């Protein structure tokens, strides 16, 4: 027989899983945001950093003390204030000690605290020693003066400061990074003098705009001599919005032809940069670099030497390529997301940030002055009682010695307060007997003057701000230094293309009748004398440079291009173009050339139509090429002819009927593709039936001689001889003399220049 179990839910809180999960996640998020990842605007520190600095001050590890083992500090921090992992705590401490990580280090370390090349190469905490740096006084000097609120530590046995009373806006000076839940912060470091100057400007001119503050704070200042190349207008926009990015670039100089990089961007590893450059060299993407060395040492923390292959290498172009392809140029995110005085995280612009910090600073100074005033007034009150005791010394001593309750009698007899009576009773009789009226009255006068000064300061907002201003200027003189990261206007870095990276050697590209291609070094190549496969032979050749594109034009008028350096060597018989390009079925490759992008060519069909085209328009990006020349029915492509001067050059066209026509090249249109305009008049039906068509074209510079070849016979035409054949573009042309009715080709003889 089963018994029913009655479950009692008395004293048990019932909540839905959704509600509980939501609340738990929210609590965790708030903890990470408020107590771990984001800094406070007052001192610019995260809780772990604040606890390390405070614990070190409590251990007496100020800038004038001896260094103590880091493990001692970490143990104190964990045991008293920060119950988390020791490695994370020590790493936070290391970061504050590294002069290449912090613009103004808070910890002065002794031992191995890491290197710029490898910041995490620091020794274990049992080996290193530390004390606070001189700059930490900015955060700690006013701590015991009633300036900040105190909160219980994690177990309630000790108190710790909720925020440190920073005399300077440390948040901007050292910057910070942090990733919370749903938000992050990235505050770059700044120059102390510049930020202090902006604070003074804001005190003098509360309505100052961000643009006006940027006159004092032009940009971040990292702990490296690398250049900030972000334009000033963009930097101002970052400060106006609280978001953006800052770009840094390495600094180099040329020594005896070698490139020496002597400053790297913030947190960039020299060894990683070396790996990146070496990787490009191994991949043969840096043919202009002969060698690479790392000469960094203790005297020169950064010295990377790049040795160019020759003195003809453009150093600026090479470095621009390296800036674009390696960490020699790096971008840093800026996100001024911080916990304000209201305890809420918010992205602030520069003016909001400085205004709120000044509000914090003025409040801190007011609390410091009030604390001192209270102390002065307490002392004056005690001195009043002490003076009464001195003036009635014998009676006071008699009361103390004879009365059972001397405190009550003293208070009643001399109208003393309880505090005054306690102070007199706590003073030894021997000291009471030694009291001097002049000393008491002298101390009273000094304290009364100080009381008046403090009351004046606390009673006037203007005088309080003036005091804050004076202290800012003094601290800037004491702890400030010159800017380390210059802000320089530089052109945007551009990576060199594969073609630009190739060495510019003279080459000749050879095309065979069957469409095989190869590339020979040099221009003095007997292309027709090269060995060809059985049944194949020489078709065309074009001289150029190895960093150019070879352009191929097929029998359908389509153009294709391939990098010349990628073509097979002429030591063999090459490879078929059809393996790398996809021409239409039945098409054959007719000609090849290596054009410069801005060079001009006349391209035509043997139907007598053509146009002028730029070299860059001959190139095609895809394997299928591009439609370049539209061919009328039955016509073929005539190889392009280079043009030197469009305005001065003449175009000569000859047909199979022995007709020759000359006209100015400028009469032809410049197109990117198409059929073009009529060059010489040939009836369309005669072209289609191949009864008559264009035999050849030639471009004649001024003063050149036109040489006609008909079999073994040649005819040279120059000067007045050519006038007979000049006419309007598109005419039929004039008949050539007997024996030259069938011209094979046109050649141009250019006289030598004086």
From Swiss-Prot:
EC number(s) reported in the record: 5.6.2.2
UniProt-annotated catalytic positions: 127
Coiled-coil regions listed: none
Alphabetized SMART domains for the sequence: TOP4c
EC class name: isomerase
PROSITE patterns attached to this UniProt entry: TOPO_IIA (PS52040)
Secretion signal span: none
Subcellular localization(s) per the UniProt record: Cell membrane
Keyword check for rRNA processing: no
Site entry (Interaction with DNA), positions: 46, 82, 84
DNA-binding in keyword set: yes
Protein name (database record): DNA topoisomerase 4 subunit A
